[in-house]
Regions:
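Small-residue-biased structural context
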Residues: 1-149
Length: 149
């Protein structure tokens, strides 16, 4: 069972980490600090976990719904999830050293541009979930508290 409170809590954590990381990574001297790297990898884990919860639980009930609009919305969000995962994986491969949990920043300006794009992508996704997906699921299921039974 997944509740809207749990999904919103995940989204709040991701948003908070994004906001903090934007400030820390904005200072070139703090990019390689242990604290920044720890928060960055926590952000990565939170995003991956959230997408996994969404992929495994929410879409199946929507994809079989009788209304085409519901199925199309679920399909769009699933496609968006795949695209975010693809972009995220390429970003992590380029800028991260997962074994040592460090950032591999060779070109700071390029790193920051790609990081800001990635943060924007994730935050836009969260906003779309809260404004479009969750209300639709509430309407379809009639359950104001549980997104997935």
């Amino acid at each position: 069972m997944v509740t809207y409170d749990e999904l919103n809590e995940q989204n709040d954590k991701i948003t908070e980490l994004t906001n903090v990381l934007e400030h820390l990574l904005g200072d070139r001297h703090l990019c390689g600090s242990a604290v920044t790297c720890e928060l960055f990898y926590r952000f990565v884990e939170e995003v991956k976990n959230h997408l996994e919860v969404m992929d495994k639980g929410l879409y199946s009930q929507l994809l079989t719904h009788q209304e085409r609009q519901v199925r199309n919305t679920a399909d769009r969000f699933m496609g968006g999830s795949k695209e975010i995962k693809r972009i995220f994986a390429a970003y992590l491969k380029k800028w991260c050293r997962p074994k040592t949990r460090e950032l591999a920043i060779k070109e700071y300006d390029q790193f920051m541009a790609e990081t800001e794009d990635m943060f924007e992508l994730v935050l836009n996704r969260i906003q779309a979930e809260q404004e479009n997906l969750y209300p639709m699921i509430r309407k379809v299921t009639g359950d104001p508290q549980r997104a997935v039974a």
